[in-house]
C-alpha cells in the first residue's frame, strides 16, 4: 500500500505525483505506483525532491539497468549521470537538447526512460516540453497509419555528435557542456517507425527530427516531406 497520489496535468500527457520521497528507500508499492503512473501519463513529475547522485541512480534502477549516455562526459564516479548546463553567457548559443527529440534512438537498444533532476532551474522560462507520440499516432488517418506501419526509420547521432556535427563547431558547442564528438556517432541503427508498447499494447510513432536520418529505401527529402505532413 502507498499513500501516493497523482494529478493529471493535461488530458493526454503528464502527471504530478505527491506522497513519495525519492531520497528515502522506495517501497515495492511506491515503485509499482511510479511505473504505472509513467505508463498512464507518459511523463511524471515529483516536486521538491532533494537527491544526491546515488539516490538519483536508485530511482533509475526501478526501471532496469542504468546506461551511460555516449558522446557526453559524465559526472565523475557516476558514468550514468551527466549534467545539462546552460551558463548565463551562453544565452545565444545552441541549446543542448533544445529541439524535439526522443533520447538515444540512435542506440540499438534505446533507454526505457530518462530521469531529469532539476538541481538549479530559472524562476521563469527554460521550459522542457514533452509530447505524446502515442496520441500523435492515434490522431493520424487510418491510411497514414497503414503507410507508416510499413516503414523503417534509420537513426544516427552523426548530425549532433559526429566529427562534423553540431557540437564539433566552436560556435555551437556550449561551454558548460562537455560534449565529445566521435566517429562512432556515424553508426546507423534501424527501428520501426511505429512501435507497440509491450506492456500497454498502444502504438506510437518512433521518429524524431534530431536522430531519424531517413526512412529505409527513401531519401532524406522524402522523409522530411512525410514529417511535415504529420
Label the predicted regions.
Residues 2-230:
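Non-heme Fe(II) oxygenase catalytic core, chiefly the N-lobe of the double-stranded beta-helix
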Amino acid at each position: 500500500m502507498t499513500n501516493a497520489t497523482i494529478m493529471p496535468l493535461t488530458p493526454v500527457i503528464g502527471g504530478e505525483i505527491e506522497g513519495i520521497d525519492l531520497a528515502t528507500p522506495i517501497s515495492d508499492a511506491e515503485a509499482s505506483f511510479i511505473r504505472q503512473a509513467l505508463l498512464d501519463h507518459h511523463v511524471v513529475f515529483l516536486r521538491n525532491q532533494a537527491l544526491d547522485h546515488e539516490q538519483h541512480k536508485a530511482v533509475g534502477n526501478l526501471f532496469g539497468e542504468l546506461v551511460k549516455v555516449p558522446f557526453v562526459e559524465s559526472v565523475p564516479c557516476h558514468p550514468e549521470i551527466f549534467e545539462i548546463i546552460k551558463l548565463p553567457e551562453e544565452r545565444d548559443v545552441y541549446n543542448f537538447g533544445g529541439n524535439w527529440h526522443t533520447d538515444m534512438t540512435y542506440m540499438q537498444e534505446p533507454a526505457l526512460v530518462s530521469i531529469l533532476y532539476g538541481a538549479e532551474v530559472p524562476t521563469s522560462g527554460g521550459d522542457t516540453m514533452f509530447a505524446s507520440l502515442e496520441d500523435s499516432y492515434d490522431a493520424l488517418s487510418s491510411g497514414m497509419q497503414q503507410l507508416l506501419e510499413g516503414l523503417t526509420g534509420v537513426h544516427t547521432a552523426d548530425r549532433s555528435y559526429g566529427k562534423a556535427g553540431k557540437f564539433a563547431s566552436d560556435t555551437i558547442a556550449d561551454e558548460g557542456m562537455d560534449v565529445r564528438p566521435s566517429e562512432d556517432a556515424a553508426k546507423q541503427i534501424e527501428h520501426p517507425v511505429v512501435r507497440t508498447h509491450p506492456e500497454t499494447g498502444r502504438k506510437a510513432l518512433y521518429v524524431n527530427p534530431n536522430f531519424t536520418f531517413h526512412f529505409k529505401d527513401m531519401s532524406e527529402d522524402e522523409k522530411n516531406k512525410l514529417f511535415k505532413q504529420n
